[in-house]
Amino acid sequence: CGDINAPCQSDCDCCGYSVTCDCYWGNECKCRESNFAIGM
């Protein structure tokens, strides 16, 4: 899985249940912490 500070192409690249993928300017994405677990 991807590093929390590494670029990611999709939510699937982010580790664990508490991260999500945010896209900023251009095609660059970064993983960030989320308040809710995926699937809840």
Curated annotation (Swiss-Prot):
Keywords: Disulfide bond, Ion channel impairing toxin, Ionotropic glutamate receptor inhibitor, Knottin, Neurotoxin, Postsynaptic neurotoxin, Secreted, Toxin, Voltage-gated sodium channel impairing toxin. Disulfide bonds join 1-15, 8-21, 14-31, 23-29. Its main location: secreted. It comes from Phoneutria reidyi (Brazilian Amazonian armed spider). Signal peptide: none annotated. GO terms for molecular function: sodium channel regulator activity; toxin activity. Potent insecticidal toxin that binds to two distinct sites in insect sodium channels, with close affinity (Kd1=34.7 pM and Kd2=35.1 pM). Its association is rather fast (1.4 and 8.5 minutes, respectively for sites 1 and 2) and its dissociation is a slower process (5.4 and 32.8 minutes, respectively). On rat brain synaptosomes the toxin partially competes (~30%) with the beta-toxin CssIV, but does not compete with the alpha-toxin AaII, nor with the beta-toxin Ts VII. Belongs to the neurotoxin 03 (Tx2) family. 05 subfamily. Expressed by the venom gland. Is not toxic to mice (30 ug per mouse tested by intracerebroventricular injection). This is Beta/delta-ctenitoxin-Pr1a. It is found in: Secreted. One of its GO terms (cellular component) is host cell postsynaptic membrane.
